[in-house]
Regions:
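Surface-exposed, charge/polar-rich loops and edge strands
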Residues: 1-170
Length: 170
């Protein structure tokens, strides 16, 4: 086990983005229609501007999607963008019920950047990519204060620690 403690002002949390290999049996038009039923959608930047915005890369273009149904900000887990994406898009639209076991979803750590998401979609290795606003240290602490754990693949911490055997010569 590797454990470390950092002051909250010395750790950076980057987004843990997602790519999905296929559209769950939907064609492109039906996929976009299903998105528009649940989200406001407009052309937008590759990096979300604020919490609540999810950037989606599909067919060579970036879109900003925002849920039509508001999130309960008093729910520290349910209000996270990763939870909103899972509950309102990945599960109902793309039929990805469990991101831990579904082979159609991959995760791209924030350090790899937006260009990696575009490369994966443009090369055909993924059908769609989602760029998320990073979880804040405050969000992380709020979840911890409830005794809960963060959703899988919701945080990418920097600096990364090298793990392995450490030897100190005396």
């Amino acid at each position: 086990m590797l454990a470390v403690a950092f002051p909250h002002n010395q750790v950076q949390i980057l987004p843990y983005n997602r790519t999905v290999k296929d559209l769950g049996g939907l064609g492109p038009v039906d996929f976009l229609e299903a998105i528009r039923e649940r989200f406001e959608m407009e052309a937008g930047p590759a990096v979300p501007r604020a919490r609540g915005d999810i950037a989606m890369y599909f067919q060579g273009a970036w879109h900003t999607v925002r849920p039509r149904i508001g999130t309960d900000r008093s729910d520290p887990i349910g209000s996270l963008d990763v939870s909103v994406l899972q509950e309102q898009l990945l599960a109902p639209v793309l039929k990805i019920a469990d991101i831990r076991t579904d082979k159609r979803i991959d995760f791209v750590g924030g350090a790899r950047g937006i260009a990696e998401l575009e490369r994966l979609v443009d090369s055909g290795k993924a059908a769609v990519a989602f760029s998320l606003y990073p979880v804040s240290v405050s969000d992380l602490m709020d979840v911890s204060d409830t005794g809960a754990i963060m959703p899988p693949k919701s945080t990418w911490f920097e600096p990364k620690l090298r793990d392995g055997l450490l030897i100190h010569v005396i």
